[in-house]
Swiss-Prot record:
The keyword DNA-binding does not apply. One of its GO terms (biological process) is spermidine acetylation. The keyword Phosphoprotein does not apply. PROSITE patterns: GNAT (PS51186). InterPro entries: Acyl_CoA_acyltransferase (IPR016181), GNAT_dom (IPR000182), YpeA/RimI_acetyltransf (IPR050680). Residues 5-152 form the N-acetyltransferase domain. This is Diamine acetyltransferase.
Length: 152
């Protein structure tokens, strides 16, 4: 039941719970100290969202939303890492999380578009239903990170 969930901006106090969720689906190569995490949470272009099960207070979803200022039109933006805990999937919660971000992008952050990269066919169906369209672009990356996980 969607009514028992809340989408809100994540805070520094959510960092370690969010990190565990993020590391379930993507490579995490470092654990930030609280001070390092606080610095990232202060970036004015980074807006982390979380989805909370209000019955138990547990964070069950995350999405990173980034604003990219543009000098000639409304801001561009990007959604990264829409993640829902495995046991909470297939309940419409990814949709709930994304709809809030889309609403905020339009009405709060003056964005003219949102981009995202998608690989999963399930996620493609979700994003298409939210009026995202495939554009013919190529992703190019210069990765200078060491993606070997560091032991804690």
């Amino acid at each position: 039941m969607i009514s028992s969930f809340e989408v809100r901006k994540a805070t520094i106090d959510d960092y370690f719970e969010l990190r565990n969720l993020i590391c379930d689906v993507t490579r995490c190569t470092e654990t930030l100290s609280r001070e390092q995490a606080e610095e990232r949470f202060r970036y004015n272009t980074y807006h982390p969202y979380c989805l909370v099960d209000t019955e138990n207070g547990r964070i069950v979803g995350y999405a990173g939303f980034y604003i990219i200022p543009h000098l000639g039109r409304k801001n561009d933006s990007r959604i990264e890492h829409v993640i829902i805990s495995k046991e909470y999937r297939n309940r419409g919660l990814g949709r709930l999380l994304c709809k809030q971000i889309i609403e905020d992008a339009k009405n709060k952050f003056n964005c003219g578009r949102i981009d995202l990269t998608v690989e999963s066919h399930i996620a493609k169906k979700l994003y298409s239903s939210l009026e995202f369209e495939k554009v013919n672009t190529e992703v190019m990356r210069n990765s200078f990170l060491d993606l070997t996980p560091k032991s804690d």
